[in-house]
Amino acid sequence: MGDKPTLVTLLTVAVSSPPPSSPLPLVSFTELLLPPPSVAAAAVAATATSEVGEKTAEQEVAAAGPETRNERRENREDEGGETRTTGTTAVKRSHDGIPRQLAERLRLCRHMDPEQDYRLPAQDVVTSWIEALRDADRDNYGRCVRHAKIHRSASHLTAYESYLVSITEQYNTASNVTEKASYVQGCIFLSFPVIYNNTQGCGYKYDWSNVVTPKAAYAELFFLLCSTSESSVVLQPLITKGGLCSSMAVYDEETMRQSQAVQIGFLHTQLVMVPFVPHACPHYAVPFTTPGKPGCGGAPSGVAGLEETAPFGRVSVTRHGATLLCRVDHLTWISKRVTTYGHKKITRYLAQFRGTMDDDEAALPGEDEAWIASKNVQYEFMGLIFTVNVDSLCVDAEQRQLLGTVATSFCHRVSDKITARNMPRAFSFYLLTSAQRGYDLRFSRNPSLFFSGDALNCPLLNEPNVFSLTVHAPYDIHFGVQPRQTVELDLRYVQITDRCFLVANLPHEDAFYTGLSVWRGGEPLKVTLWTRTRSIVIPQGTPIATLYQITEGDGNVYSYNHHTVFRQMHAAGATTFFLGDMQLPADNFLTSPHP
């Protein structure tokens, strides 16, 4: 326990910077690279033995003591389980006892600091900075105001109208454009040819098509690209910035009958580009759950993935004001698997823990509190990156215990070469706690394990993109059986305002199509995918969908066929726009100027 951290500790455990209110002793990166005395002694003994030439490698290891044998065994595991001895010749080591191959690697990155990705400014500096901004706000009275995400409830077409006219004219002047686009009542209408390929002699209903459209450059301005009801070929809806777009095309029955004899031909689809400005993603938090009570959004009570028969790790919790610093030891990891294409694949690793506050007088988090965790911590094994973070937490007030789980995220692929023995034995994270009422959006689990995007890390980023989140594949998705797959993630949310998430395609994705749908609070997230060919495999960790915040409306996109078109309805002197059975909220889809 008195030795300095070993090299294995450096490579396998990410060090999280403690809060400034409780500073820990700093250890330089050079000190961390120095071997403990036991390893140094073993290295000297090995050098002397090689000069005399009397001891074999096995005798050297036996004489080194159990501590050194364990460290060498860990080094062998860290190198992917390769044998470190051949016959009677030990693996060559550098002068400081580190394997030569590993020493060369460390020499190349010796100037790097693994803590740079986790370093934050001191809390008193941040507090002073915020107070200075408030003082500046008073001086700026009557001028501009600092932006708040929630204050704007709707966008206005008049802010973009001249720009939309400009990009329409720019599109029409291109030499390769044969069908001119027109800007009418806030939308861009255009016609585009679709190649119909029936060389195999049997008509089919689904196809794939690429189209080129006007392109927007504003960060918050997108388009809903879809077909109108006059189209014989219906392009399935996309959320796009414009430019080159790929989507699934659907032919109606009449078009299929008329095109049976045609081998290769052209059909035209009538397209509309509806300006779309999503809401900025609000600040989020995850409520603390309590035993026996339903979680956020109707999620099951307790901790997600908790297994009473599995061993618990031990967590010690230190309170620093509104921040909880958690140190977890003795973790036992459980692999979660799914059967895909006839093979069981690892989807993630999960470990559970429980423990108490270090200070018996410190208060436990209450039911009305919520938390935001520190960022995902990166680990590496055999050159493969994966990330780990806290998943869910439960407070047992009667036992004064904190129960929870840590898990690998879906944002990276978990290789089959990684086993539970390679997972970190200890972990650390911090929680920023505050009252639930201060957050409009509350998830049932840590969204950082499921999504990526600037909106999850706004306080740490300069000019973040707060208009979208990216969903990643939770496992390898095979399309060998059928071209349509639905992926379900056990994640729910509750939102106080009348907003929800729009599940949409990835920009410029042409290998598969993501069906447009609405994800409402209290429901698990479902993503429906189509592929062009059945030989495509989407690896775990691949982005598969994009989430946008919109004002909640009626209906949803329930089917993806020739009825999924843009249409309008007139009633009581008002016009309402629909995409299939989904009503388009006027706050986000700008089809006409707001009064």
Swiss-Prot record:
Origin: domain of life: Viruses
Gene Ontology biological process: symbiont-mediated suppression of host innate immune response
Major localization listed first in the record, in broad terms: host cell
Region span, Disordered: 47-94
Localisation per UniProt entry: Host cytoplasm; Host nucleus
Alphabetical keyword list: Host cytoplasm, Host nucleus, Host-virus interaction, Inhibition of host innate immune response by virus, Signal, Viral immunoevasion
GO annotations of cellular component type: host cell cytoplasm; host cell nucleus
Signal peptide: 1-40
Compositional bias ranges of the Basic and acidic residues kind: 68-82
Function, as annotated: Plays a role in the inhibition of host innate immune system by targeting host CGAS and promoting dissociation of DNA from CGAS, thereby inhibiting the enzymatic activity of CGAS.
Assembly description: Interacts with host CGAS.
Family (UniProt): Belongs to the herpesviridae U10 family.
Protein name: Protein UL31
Source organism per UniProt: Human cytomegalovirus (strain Merlin)
Upper lineage: Viruses, Duplodnaviria, Heunggongvirae, Peploviricota, Herviviricetes
Gene: UL31
